[in-house]
Amino acid sequence: AQAAATLAAVLIGHGIIMENGERLLNDDVLNGTVVMILFTCIISSVVTERAARKMVTQENLMEGSEGKEQERILIPVANPETIEGLVGMALMMRHPKQKESLVALSVINDNNTSETKELIGKRNLERTAMIAAAADASVKTVLRYDLNIAQGIIHTQKEYAVTDIVIGLHRKTNLMDSFFGTMTENLLKGTNRQIMIAKLLMPVNTLRRIVVAVPDKAEYEKGFLKWMTQLCRMGKQLGCRVHFFATEDTLKHLRALTEKQEANTFTEFSLLEEWDDLLLLTGHVNYCLLYTSDAADDKA
């Protein structure tokens, strides 16, 4: 608006011809004004972008230093084979001082209820509570009826103020099935909480390295500090190394944050120039796939 007003004033002055035949504002003034406006517009956009990035990173640091958020991790249980792994994952990523931060959920489809399904759901919840108790942690068990599993998880997340959700990776049943499955996709669309999707092929406590592929500019997303802290927390709990792969700019933020807040974590940093190179990391990953999503933004 200021640039437009300045240009309009100069154009008016340029159009005024005095008695001696000269313009009130000559061509040099007009050209200088145009160059000045062009220069300031370019510089201001660059300065604004840099300032916005600094503000975002500073907000992330303040968010982590304040630590006011009460963690509550939701563990939907349906497959008995994955319960132990999901509970172990939740125990590793939770804050050690928050003993009552776990919520286990079993959802029964309201349109297809039966005593058998209710009994299976209760058994899964009982087993979840036993596994958590063995690690000196308490878990609140919830059995609920809903239209579908995704809606049941979303409603429970709202009712219990859940901050994180840990679920197992969908198992494809046919060629037309998507990678994440309908339930997970609906869950990603319906909630703005951090979701960890894990496929564990061996017990969590036997892991010796955590490989993290980070997309470009992930440091400017709201949940960046949170999931980075939780992965480093898992690394400290397991006594294993956390290996980050990211672009050069993102690696700078990761190094700075880990040195400041996670100095006791064993970390490595490697350059990942293009996201298409993600398949090159498969040689580093043998036993675990962990996918993290926060709100509408995805991170691996």
Q: Would you name each region that the model predicts?
A:
Residues 1-75, 81, 120, 167, ...:
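Membrane-interfacial segments at transmembrane helix termini in multi-pass membrane proteins
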Residues 6, 184, 297:
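Short, flexible micro-motifs
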Residues 161-162, 285-289:
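Short acidic/histidine-rich motifs immediately flanking catalytic phosphotransfer sites
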Residues 68-281:
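Structured cytosolic domains appended to multi-pass membrane proteins
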Residues 2, 39, 135, 191, ...:
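Single, functionally critical "micro-switch" positions that shape active/binding sites
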Residues 291-300:
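Conserved small/polar residues in nucleotide/adenosyl-binding loops
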Residues 45-46, 186, 194, 295-296:
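Proline-centered helix-kink/hinge sites
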